[in-house]
Amino acid sequence: MRFISASSLLLALAPTLNAVPVEVAGSAQGLDVTLSQVGNTRIKAVVKNTGSEDVTFVHLNFFKDAAPVQKVSLFRNGMLPNLNLATTEVQFQGIKQRLITEGLSDDALTTLAPGATIEDEFDIASTSDLSEGGTITINSNGLVPITTDNKVTGYIPFTSNELSIDVDAAEAASVTQAVKILERRTKVTSCSGSRLSALQTALRNTVSLARAAATAAQSGSSSRFQEYFKTTSSSTRSTVAARLNAVANEAASTSSGSTTYYCSDVYGYCSSNVLAYTLPSYNIIANCDLYYSYLPALTSTCHAQDQATTTLHEFTHAPGVYSPGTDDLGYGYSAATALSASQALLNADTYALFANGTYSSLLSFVNPLLTPDNSCQPQLLDARTCNRQFGRSTSCKVYWKAVE
């Protein structure tokens, strides 16, 4: 991972993201999305509340978000199964953003009465390269956070029809790209002062959390792993551990690695509810002002947000750290733990929650008063394991004294 200083130049990186669509079981309470073509690559989405009650949800990272986020999945050869052509997902070249889960502003929320709808129009060629034209299959499904009193309290599933369109190559190539990478000769804001100090602390904490979580994934409690990743298979545990170790390795260096990390919003995609964002196709991460003003460096509360797990979350998005990069399939504990095993394996928040849960469970054993409202059950670690996972921190010293 590389910091960008005032004298550094941003180099173009080769796109490598390969996202995976979500599969969500049908539900009486949900959102139905109807996709239609209104131009060559311009798509209209009508989102309808199919439930019997009002629902208030976060429309960021969803339809109505003005940022270049992924609203649909695009596939080639999706409608040609009889020709034995492999279905290929078209690479998404927009941003993935992490949001706050409490204190959301009203302009980030949408309320739909039963049967009510909202509409959104967007150009899929602005966030994907469709310049070769041809048949594209489009769909959208997943989980969107719902709120009570501006706090994320659960999720609601959404699913769409499958839309097939024929794309004119020349017209698609003329669409302006939503994300414009800084010119090679452009100098960008340096990472210095209090923000540099905060990010350096976050990176050190990320290393500790990721390594501890990797150990827990590889050889820790099977029931705890099942809680987050919905399986206890050895191959999945190894994959999760490998990704977390890769995150730890990336966070351990500020002068080398696969990602470029900005201390500030150099691309202008931060809003009042966004903590940080990643451009996976370029392995670029940027923090927002809220990252520094809203988040603690490291929380002791189970499944709460902090700077370390936000940085860990963003690193998992970057395919340069570990490929394929993760998606945002389920946001927050209730949504993340509702995913299938295959979805959880590629969900960024699952890794952040698992890392936080591993750390919080240790603290709750050392001092239960640190996590009075936690759902992370304490795990019994001997002093040697504690120090191997977290180093000789204060928590380990307290635990050591209590045990020995």
From Swiss-Prot:
Superkingdom as given in the UniProt entry: Eukaryota
Active site: 314
SUPFAM superfamilies (alphabetical): Metalloproteases ('zincins'), catalytic domain (SSF55486)
EC assignment: 3.4.24.39
Keyword vocabulary terms for this entry: Cleavage on pair of basic residues, Disulfide bond, Hydrolase, Metal-binding, Metalloprotease, Protease, Secreted, Signal, Zinc, Zymogen
Example of a GO biological process term: proteolysis
Enzyme class: hydrolase
Reactions accelerated catalytically: Preferential cleavage of bonds with hydrophobic residues in P1'. Also 3-Asn-|-Gln-4 and 8-Gly-|-Ser-9 bonds in insulin B chain
Residue ranges the record assigns to the propeptide: 20-185
Signal peptide (from-to): 1-19
Required cofactor(s): Zn(2+)
CDD domains the record matches: M35_deuterolysin_like (cd11008)
Cofactor note: Binds 1 zinc ion per subunit.
Chief place where the protein resides: secreted
Pfam assignment, any one: Peptidase_M35
Binding site for Zn(2+): 313, 317, 328
An example Gene Ontology molecular-function term: metal ion binding
Function comment: Secreted metalloproteinase that allows assimilation of proteinaceous substrates. Shows high activities on basic nuclear substrates such as histone and protamine.
Database matches in PANTHER family: NEUTRAL PROTEASE 2-RELATED, PTHR37016
Family indicated by similarity: Belongs to the peptidase M35 family.
Protein name: Neutral protease 2 homolog AFLA_065450
Taxonomic classification: Eukaryota, Fungi, Dikarya, Ascomycota, Pezizomycotina
